[in-house]
Amino acid sequence: MMLSQCLINYRSFQLDHYAIPHLPPTLREDYVQNGDLYQLEQVGPHLYYFLPPGSSILSVPFVLVANAFGISAVKSDNSFSIEGETGIEASLAAFLMAVLAAVFFYMARLMLPLGYSLLVVVGGALGTQIWSTASRAMFTDTWAVLLFGIVIFAVLAYEINGTRVRVLLIGSLLAWAYFTAPVYAIHIAAISLYLLFIFTARQILAYALAGIGWAAGFVIYSWHNFSELLPSYFRPGRLHFRAFWIALSGNLISPSRGLLIFVPTVLFVVYLLIRFRAQLKNKRLVAFALAAIAAQLIVISGFDHWWGGHSYGPRLATGLVPWCVLLGILGLKAMLASREDRGNVATSRTFALPFAGLLLLAFSVFVHARGAISSATAVWSVLPANVDQQPARIWDWRQPQFLAGLLPPPFPASVPPLPTRTRIDFTTREAEPYLWYGWSSAEPESRWTSATRATIIFSLSEIRPMALQIKMAPFLVAGKLEEQRVSIKLNGQSMTELSLSNPDLTIYPVLLPANTLRKRNTLEFHISGAASPASLGVGADERQLGIRVASAELIPQ
């Protein structure tokens, strides 16, 4: 949203107008990163937003509305406002995906009764990445999937009712889907090939000219700003296919990124298409949809970073959702047609099939509710190990991402040593090997617990009486939450109980007798009064906050 604000204030894509530090350049394979800020690209003396510009441009009207209410991604001193950024993103993303849910409903009503149409909306909007990813923040897919969903709706309306396809509108929607997320080039190709079968020569020419016009404008934008035909993010050189088969299987069946695990309703849709293929209409459209789905799975498996970094589930496959919704509608229509052909005679399969579908739908909604609501699923990406540094975690069935916060992570194979008089700074990444579960990401002064239980693990080379000095403070809300009671256990044995009512960071010593210490130790904090700021009406934070810890240090006795 900062780029949107820059376009409003300065009519420029250069972010130099704002108080953004020019950090030492980090040479990435495809661009020059501004220090450790992957979102920013250095081009000569200028700073640009590395991610696609389409979302920022389309969001300008909404940023103007936010500005009218005093909300901005830029503070009065021209520095970045994380509060303004997240506030605008969360509201806009939720609104856009609500519009997409309406599009899904009207798509379904073209072919299905009201009840089935509502089930399609629940599955498409709540049982997919639309809820857990695209509605939570302004990802590149958020605008793109809405634009593409409208295109699919227009195509289905033509197939069912013969509704006129507006050539320039379709061309423009597809162009802007590409400007917001270049992976949608796959879907543009699929739709373009499909249109060859239904358009007249004159319509094809108009469609091609619309695409050429938008493409020319984009090349001019890129050349003016970067002296390149395409911006860095859009170049195909980012695809390497070095771990293709691992990536493809991971994108399909891994417990923390697999499409078939997070959206098992896809399996139900595939069954419908096969089982009722004789009653299936619009088979040409089905073929294009399946080809586009397969192509995107191949492309996203070509990235070295195929798991999508610190994200939830199959984020990189979000663009498949409109196709899957379309196939679901066609499959359900074929199922209903089959029933009519049999005279609506009830059989055991008649009842078993809807039950199986509803069961898979309920599981899909549960999985994506976890990603949308539980902060523990976000913390999973960094604790107990950073998934970008240990991507093997994606395959660990002992704690799938969607069960983070419900299941503790497996006990680490390696427990870091904690030398005496060595302070663990909880604001740094160096502290993370000591944190097992129940912790949030680091903040400037401390790190919050995010559940009623949180643990620290450490190993000792010498066992003797120790005192652990913990610098911490409780989460308090005047008049609503006046103290936090903290019970501390070492290796399952109670050490102390504290009543914390001082809101300032304070050092609390905890005695650790030699007879309770082991070579490998687990220190557990139980905070029964942990609560979310949102539940107490003091903010939008849904994390279950108990205490915040700044540091911990072992002192020999």
For the regions a protein language model found, what residue spans apply to each?
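Interfacial juxtamembrane loops and adjacent helix segments
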Residues: 9-91, 238-239, 304
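C-terminal luminal/periplasmic domains and tails of membrane-associated envelope-modifying transferases
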Residues: 387-557
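Transmembrane-helix signature of polytopic, membrane-embedded enzymes
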Residues: 71-80, 99-127, 146, 160-169
